[in-house]
């Protein structure tokens, strides 16, 4: 993965190299579109440049689709401090300004343009070791273009669809059906191009055919569910049906080589070898974190990989900014919050999740494995953060949190266990969270398989891992609960409740939940902010966010603003 990072920096420079005119038309001094890419090494740099877009967005995670998917869902609030209006606005489907998502828009379209370049040029490169190698790389470009468009379409709905580097001028916003048709088409191309081989340890961080099959199911389920369709017509006139997607997800589940990790707790960083025996919850449990000492998670099918080379320069995105945002707010003594490390307090967990989970599955070990019950686990925790915490609750997310560890000599704690495990020379908690952010996990594949086939096989495999009894008959409610518990805080809940058309009911439960404001008991009352959760969801036609006003202005009015964002949507603060 370190190699991928270095290549990415080269790729960025090369992709945007300027082209000058010489009397001799042969360019001997620089690479540009007339002579790049040509070789296998060039092709590898181009692909690295597309993946690098994941890190670029990670540098500003508060604007990302992943953060939106967490904070806008019914299982979290916005949180953060009184000046972190962006976080609270996402939760409320409001806006702190006119360009709240512009950086994400710009960054993802840069990634799409790199993917367009790869799709157009990699077939002409020489030096591939095999046809499979060439097809694998082109397939990865199709996957990443689809993934980036999936995020943009889910977030904004009405977006320009640019699939060629030759596009000039302003491309109008596409009909959503056209955008989703292209997403599904790209994933189909990725499935057909990439060989039936699981990503090797040496290529960890790259996607494979099976990740494309999983992403196909995710995209198909959202499009057909949210828009109430049964199939989708592709740009070439062919159709992808539910049966087609079942065939792909069956192949993924049966032949991919990915598997469920036997103990659910081993998926999360608090089970690392430096922390587990000092944490009461994990002590003596014979746990082994799947990523200990750079090991590869056998359940992870697509993840953002990080490295210890993050810095305050252009490489800040090499550290896990999402973990930092979800960390414990307030610079509290690490001994009082152990093993959970410092951060900005985004996404406090709604008390309703703990209550619903306890009522539905009182014996489910995943609840305590996923959610920190602060009064029970952290009795020395201090409410209020820097006396500015908004929407604080008694619950934190364990899965994505920074994790600290005790120092072996003397008193004290490492801010993150990675500082010790990977021998950091300079320590900074803002740059040293480097555990993966998993975007597609094999458990999700099994649950999507059950949903598509309306059977209990995948559900029961997931339940068995957690020590729960099997269910005898498939039902939508059983499937929906299983996804909520198994995949909590993994960026899928928001699109799930939207595509199932239960968002209004789910979001309404957030009203009047117990929270704290600046350390004092409060209620989550939101009706003064656009009428509240349900009103805003309805006004925005199902939870779509605003097109950045600067992009509308730059388009000369070609782009039109999304419904529900015309006026009166400015969030100025909690109180």
Per-segment meaning from a language model:
Residues 20-84, 188-189, 206, 210, ...:
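An aromatic- and glycine-enriched ligand-binding surface/loop that stacks and positions planar moieties
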Residues 3-6, 13-41, 183, 217, ...:
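Bacterial Sec-dependent N-terminal signal peptides
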Residues 18-20, 108-111, 222, 272-330, ...:
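Long, intrinsically disordered, low-complexity segments
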Residues 39-40, 44-62, 80-156, 168-181, ...:
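Conserved, well-structured interaction surfaces
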Residues 157-165, 193-202, 259-266, 472:
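Glycine- and aromatic-rich loop/turn segments at beta-sheet edges
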Residues 151-155, 160, 198, 219-231:
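Short coil/turn linking the two alpha-helices of tandem helical-hairpin repeats
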Residues 28-32, 92-96, 161-169:
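Short linear capping/connector segments at secondary-structure termini
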Residues 357-464:
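C-terminal substrate/ligand-recognition segments
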């Amino acid at each position: 993965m370190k190699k991928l990072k270095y290549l990415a920096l080269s790729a960025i420079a090369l992709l945007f190299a300027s082209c000058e005119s010489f009397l001799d038309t042969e360019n001997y001094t620089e690479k540009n579109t007339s002579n790049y890419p040509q070789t296998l090494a060039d092709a590898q740099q181009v692909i690295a440049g597309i993946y690098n877009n994941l890190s670029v967005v990670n540098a500003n995670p508060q604007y990302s689709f992943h953060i939106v998917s967490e904070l806008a869902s019914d299982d979290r609030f916005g949180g953060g401090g009184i000046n972190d209006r962006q976080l609270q606005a996402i939760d409320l489907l409001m806006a702190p300004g006119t360009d709240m998502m512009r950086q994400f828009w710009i960054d993802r379209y840069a990634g799409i343009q790199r993917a367009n370049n790869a799709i157009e040029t990699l077939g002409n490169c020489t030096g591939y070791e095999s046809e499979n190698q060439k097809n694998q790389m082109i397939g990865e470009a199709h996957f990443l273009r689809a993934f980036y468009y999936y995020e943009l379409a889910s977030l904004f709905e009405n977006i320009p669809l640019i699939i060629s580097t030759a596009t000039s001028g302003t491309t109008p916003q596409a009909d959503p059906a056209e955008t989703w048709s292209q997403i599904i088409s790209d994933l189909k191309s990725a499935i057909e191009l990439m060989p039936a081989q699981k990503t090797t340890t040496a290529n960890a961080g790259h996607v494979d055919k099976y990740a494309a099959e999983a992403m196909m199911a995710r995209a198909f389920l959202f499009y057909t569910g949210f828009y109430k369709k049964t199939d989708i017509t592709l740009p070439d006139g062919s159709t992808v049906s539910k049966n087609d997607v079942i065939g792909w997800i069956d192949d993924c589940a049966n032949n991919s080589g990915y598997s469920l990790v036997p103990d659910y707790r081993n998926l999360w960083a608090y089970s690392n070898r430096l922390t587990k025996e000092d944490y009461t919850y994990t002590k003596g449990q014979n746990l082994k974190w799947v990523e200990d000492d750079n090991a590869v998670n056998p359940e992870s099918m697509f993840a953002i990989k990080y490295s210890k080379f993050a810095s305050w320069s252009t490489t800040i995105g090499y550290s896990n900014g999402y973990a930092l945002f979800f960390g414990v707010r307030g610079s509290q003594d690490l001994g009082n919050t152990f093993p959970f490390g410092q951060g900005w307090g985004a996404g406090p967990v709604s008390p309703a999740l703990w209550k619903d989970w306890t009522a539905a599955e009182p014996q489910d070990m995943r609840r305590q494995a996923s959610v920190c019950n602060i009064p029970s686990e952290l009795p020395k925790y201090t409410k209020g953060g820097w006396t500015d915490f908004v929407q604080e609750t008694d619950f934190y997310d364990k899965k994505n949190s920074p994790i600290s560890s005790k120092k072996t000599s003397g008193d004290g704690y490492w801010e993150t266990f990675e500082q010790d495990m990977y021998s950091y020379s300079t320590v900074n908690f803002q740059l040293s969270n480097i555990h993966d952010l998993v975007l597609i996990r094999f458990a999700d594949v099994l649950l999507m398989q059950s949903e598509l086939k309306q059977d209990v096989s995948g559900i029961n495999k997931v339940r068995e891992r957690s020590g729960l009894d099997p269910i005898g008959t498939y039902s939508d409610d059983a499937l929906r609960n299983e996804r909520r518990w198994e995949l909590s805080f993994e960026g899928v809940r928001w699109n799930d409740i939207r595509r199932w058309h239960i968002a209004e009911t789910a979001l309404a439960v957030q009203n009047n939940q117990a929270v704290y404001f600046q350390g004092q008991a409060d209620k989550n009352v939101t009706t003064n902010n656009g009428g509240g959760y349900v009103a805003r969801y309805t006004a925005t036609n199902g939870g779509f966010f605003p097109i950045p006003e600067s992009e509308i202005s730059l388009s000369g009015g070609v782009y039109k603003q999304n419904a529900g964002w015309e006026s009166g949507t400015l969030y100025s603060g909690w109180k």
